[in-house]
Every structure is written in structure tokens, then in C-alpha cells.
């Protein structure tokens, strides 16, 4: 067969579908900083919808929540690397740790 008569065959590319960053139970709110940090770059910019793989409505709500958190100074407008690392550790969802109380020894009266 001539090259000119060959049919064009598309290469089979694997379609990656990553799990969405927003779960069904997550509230998009300016107070939910652990969620908002997922959508901010290291420089402090809001990541695009293509990068986040969010719907238009979710992206709009995330953008509004990030802007509200910045105005209320919960998030900085420009991130420094040290702030991002400290804040992410601080606001990560932590597993509840069961703590036992140690009994307080009372002093005896004389």
C-alpha cells in the first residue's frame, strides 16, 4: 500500500480520570481552609479549572471562598513557601486522637 492511500489511525491514548478533589460531603466555604489549600498554587494563585478538574459551578464557588478568606486574612494574598508549609500542616484534617486524662493528685491538708 502507498503511504498516501493508508488510513489515518488515531493512537489510543489512555484517558486519565483522577478522583475529584471535592467529595460529595465537602462544603465549599471560606472557613474550610484544608479544602481551599488544595486549589492554591505555591505562589498563592488560584489554580485554573483545567488543573483542578472541577465543574464551572464548583470553580466559581472555590474562587469566591478563596477571595473571602483572603479578605478576612485567613489566607495571604501572596504566599511565601514557609507560610504554605506551616499552614497546610496546621489545617490538615487530622484523625481524632483519644486522650486519657491523668488524675490530679490533691495535696493533703495538715
UniProtKB/Swiss-Prot annotation:
Location of the protein in the cell: Plastid, Chloroplast
Source taxon at top rank: Eukaryota
Pfam families per the UniProt record, alphabetical: Ribosomal_S18 (PF01084)
Keywords (A to Z) from UniProt: Chloroplast, Plastid, Ribonucleoprotein, Ribosomal protein, RNA-binding, rRNA-binding
GO biological process assignments: translation
This protein's GO CC annotations: chloroplast; mitochondrial small ribosomal subunit
Record-linked InterPro entries: Ribosomal_bS18, Ribosomal_bS18_CS, Ribosomal_bS18_sf
Keyword Plastid: yes
Gene Ontology molecular function: small ribosomal subunit rRNA binding; structural constituent of ribosome
Keyword flag Ribonucleoprotein: yes
Entry's family note: Belongs to the bacterial ribosomal protein bS18 family.
Quaternary structure, from the entry: Part of the 30S ribosomal subunit.
Protein name: Small ribosomal subunit protein bS18c
Amino acid at each position: 500500500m502507498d503511504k498516501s492511500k493508508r488510513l489515518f489511525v488515531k493512537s489510543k491514548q489512555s484517558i486519565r480520570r483522577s478522583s475529584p478533589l471535592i467529595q460529595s460531603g465537602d462544603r465549599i466555604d471560606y472557613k474550610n481552609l484544608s479544602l481551599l489549600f488544595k486549589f492554591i498554587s505555591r505562589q498563592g494563585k488560584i489554580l485554573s479549572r483545567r488543573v483542578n478538574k472541577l465543574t464551572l459551578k464548583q470553580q466559581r464557588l472555590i474562587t469566591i471562598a478563596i477571595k473571602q478568606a483572603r479578605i478576612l486574612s485567613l489566607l495571604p494574598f501572596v504566599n511565601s513557601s514557609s507560610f504554605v508549609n506551616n499552614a497546610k500542616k496546621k489545617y490538615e484534617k487530622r484523625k481524632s486522637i483519644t486522650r486519657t486524662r491523668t488524675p490530679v493528685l490533691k495535696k493533703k491538708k495538715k
